[in-house]
């Protein structure tokens, strides 16, 4: 699928493109030009190495302070602020390609302090010292991609006129960015300060929309996107006014600081989703990576304890079948509910006399490591009741929802357990299942909510191990800003259920995807589908109605699952239930997914609603090719009208003609399908058919 290497040097091609650009977005074009280079994992068609638009002069960040005016700019985006003894004011933000400007706006931020008659606005605060230009040096070892590139910032320190709060403000532009971030750190300087609300975006202009129905949804306006980078933030549009704010429930303690951030970015015409995704991939806690792993739920344990012998058995079974026999890369073996002693607080049961040390040793033979399930609120059903009873007896904080992670005593214990898992047992993955009390403060807590406590915990864990995979499940929702902390969140709905028609397995697939459509595609349209926990592949002894495959539908589940592009690739599988052909299908699809991660990172929804038995699927694109996965959830044949222009959301300058064929071995010899942008191709799908097409530019 890789195009031929160009004869002209990349440097010359980029330079020629810059000279020719007028209304064409520079970054989109540069991505096309760099598509022939080897992919760098997750960001292949966003940022490629060693040379790309990200490192070009045109996308290099510049900062300047001249008189009262501070500015950040590159060829893609620029912003100006007025910083004077009277305060800080945003003047304008400009799209460097189209010249479109978001006009004079006013304060850069505002604080609502309890008891005040109005807000403390940045434009009426006292400037302390002089504004500064900062050089941001790249850290090649950083987990977050944006920190691996250089950048510039402008900063200033301000105080309110009553000398209660000091604000350390800065605006940041990294090389290659099509967005500018704003950060503020609040410090209470005269005593505890009851800050009720922080507003970091207050913009006026025609046509803003909140892109989602959940907390932490961004705002869009034409080709622009805005947001306060926190999953508990509130985005509101009233007429032509758009605001992004977040509430605090605890006073800011004297001498302590609290940091908040926002983003404003611009994309090329018709590329809003992809442009926002590019921002997410650069700023998320860890960029996209396929993470294939076994999960013990439905297999070793199902509300029941298990032991070291069983755990070692599945590690070696999967290692033999996938790694040794079929060359599949395995990342982790996650041990779900059942490893702990319920009459303790997250201590190993007697079946693990050496903790996970033996599991770590055996997993390492296959290039993997152990992962672990922990439930901040205490788990479910019988085991939950036992844990909560023990916790109550020993003074750990609880509420009607279970354990309170923000409770001082429980947080210390939970934090200690998690850090030990990383340091002592080499755990490379956490499945945190169940966080509540998103807007409740526990007496004596230093956190605004359990979610704030979880964010603090995750930051500490990532400081200990930068490549850690963190999956937040129950309690999350499709705010893209979760990904500043976690790698994936829950799709919503039940773990497993059945809807539609066909065999049990076909109904499970339909349910899985209908839940995704309802809870994510419709509720959080800019949330990356590549970062969902879908509840994996299920073929396990304790999975009711999914412990057999009498209809031979396992290949359909496998092909549709890997077609979703999700990086959290879970296998809820009892190895003894799989036959040789099942392992073959699983291995082929898993390896295909890893090879094509640079394309699948772009996965987005196409088609209709699975709950209505409409044809649906996923599409993804990069300059080197595209992938389409379609599924017919009905018992009768259906058709799908495919136009790669809309399916791939092709940017200007992209290849328009493609040759498409199935990548699977059982389709070898099948004629290729010719696809062309703006030409509709009718795809005929048999009942329950899953069709995967790899499209190569021609």
Language model features: what each stretch is:
Residues 255, 454-668, 682-684, 689-692:
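Active-site-proximal substrate-binding groove within the catalytic cores of carbohydrate-active enzymes
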Residues 1-25, 34, 48-49:
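N-terminal secretory signal peptides
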Residues 328-339, 415-444:
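Active-site groove signature of glycoside hydrolases
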Residues 131-133, 138-371, 375-385, 568-611, ...:
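Conserved structural scaffold segments of CAZyme catalytic domains across common CAZy folds
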Residues 344-352, 378-399, 484-494:
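Aromatic- and acidic-residue-enriched segments that line the glycan-binding/catalytic groove
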Residues 67-155:
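Acidic-aromatic substrate-binding/catalytic surfaces of carbohydrate-active enzymes
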Residues 302, 371-425:
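Active-site-adjacent "subsite" loops/lids of carbohydrate-active enzymes
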């Amino acid at each position: 699928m890789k195009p031929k290497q160009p004869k002209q040097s990349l440097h010359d091609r980029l330079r020629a493109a810059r000279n020719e650009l007028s209304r064409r977005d520079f970054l989109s074009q540069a991505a096309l030009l760099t598509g022939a280079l080897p992919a760098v994992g997750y960001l292949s068609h966003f940022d490629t190495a060693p040379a790309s638009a990200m490192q070009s002069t045109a996308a290099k960040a510049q900062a300047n302070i001249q008189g009262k005016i501070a500015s950040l700019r590159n060829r893609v985006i620029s912003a100006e602020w007025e910083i004077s003894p009277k305060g800080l004011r945003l003047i304008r933000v400009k799209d460097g390609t189209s010249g479109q400007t978001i006009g004079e706006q006013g304060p850069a931020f505002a604080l609502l302090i309890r008891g005040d008659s109005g807000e403390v606005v940045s434009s009426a605060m006292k400037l302390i010292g002089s504004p500064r230009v900062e050089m941001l040096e790249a850290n090649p070892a950083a987990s977050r991609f944006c920190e691996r590139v250089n950048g510039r910032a402008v900063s200033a320190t301000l105080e309110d006129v009553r000398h209660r709060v000091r604000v350390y403000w800065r605006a940041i532009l990294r090389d290659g960015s099509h967005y500018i971030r704003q950060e503020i750190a609040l410090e209470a300087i005269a005593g505890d300060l009851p800050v009720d609300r922080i507003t970091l975006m207050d913009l006026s202009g025609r046509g803003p929309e909140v892109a989602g129905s959940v907390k932490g949804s961004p705002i869009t306006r034409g080709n622009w996107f805005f947001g306060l980078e926190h999953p508990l933030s509130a985005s509101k549009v009233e007429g032509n006014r758009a605001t992004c704010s977040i509430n605090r429930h605890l006073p800011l303690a004297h001498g302590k600081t609290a940091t908040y951030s926002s983003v404003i970015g611009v994309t090329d015409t018709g590329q809003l989703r992809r442009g926002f995704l590019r921002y997410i991939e650069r700023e998320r806690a860890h960029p996209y990576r396929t993470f294939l792993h076994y999960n013990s739920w439905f297999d070793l344990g199902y509300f029941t304890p298990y032991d070291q012998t069983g755990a070692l058995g599945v590690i070696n079974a999967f290692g033999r079948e996938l790694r040794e026999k079929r060359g599949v890369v395995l990342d982790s073996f996650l041990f779900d509910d059942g490893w702990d002693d319920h009459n303790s607080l997250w201590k190993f049961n007697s079946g693990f006399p050496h903790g996970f040390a033996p599991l770590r040793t055996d997993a390492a033979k296959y290039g993997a490591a152990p992962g672990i399930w922990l439930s901040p609120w205490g788990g479910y059903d019988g085991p939950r009741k036992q844990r909560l009873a023990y916790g109550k007896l020993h003074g750990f904080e609880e509420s009607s929802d279970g354990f309170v992670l923000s409770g001082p005593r429980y947080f210390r214990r939970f934090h200690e357990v998690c850090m030990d898992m990383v340091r002592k047992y080499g755990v490379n993955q956490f499945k945190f299942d169940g966080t509540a009390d998103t807007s409740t403060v526990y007496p004596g807590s230093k956190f605004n909510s359990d979610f704030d406590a979880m964010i603090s915990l995750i930051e500490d864990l990532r400081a200990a191990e930068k490549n850690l995979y963190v999956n937040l499940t129950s309690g999350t929702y499709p705010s893209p800003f979760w990904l500043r902390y976690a790698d994936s969140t829950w799709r919503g709905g039940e773990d497993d259920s059945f809807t539609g028609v066909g065999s049990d397995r076909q109904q499970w697939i339909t349910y899985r995807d209908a839940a995704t459509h309802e809870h994510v595609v419709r509720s959080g349209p800019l949330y990356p589908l590549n970062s969902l926990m879908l509840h994996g592949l299920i073929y396990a002894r304790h999975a009711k109605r999914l412990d057999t495959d009498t209809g031979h539908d396992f290949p359909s589940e496998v092909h549709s699952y890997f077609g979703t592009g999700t990086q959290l690739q879970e296998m809820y599988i009892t190895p003894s239930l799989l036959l040789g052909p099942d392992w073959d299908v699983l291995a082929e699809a898993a390896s295909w997914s890893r090879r094509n991660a640079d394309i699948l990172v772009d996965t987005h929804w196409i088609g209709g609603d699975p709950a209505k038995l409409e044809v649906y699927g996923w599409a993804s694109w990069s300059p080197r090719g595209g992938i389409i996965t379609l599924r017919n959830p009905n018992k009768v044949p259906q058709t799908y009208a495919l136009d790669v222009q809309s399916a791939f959301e092709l940017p200007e300058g992209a290849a328009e003609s493609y040759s498409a064929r199935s990548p699977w071995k059982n389709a070898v010899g099948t004629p290729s399908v010719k696809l062309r942008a703006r030409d509709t191709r009718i795809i005929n799908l048999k009942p329950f058919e899953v069709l995967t097409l790899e499209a190569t530019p021609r």
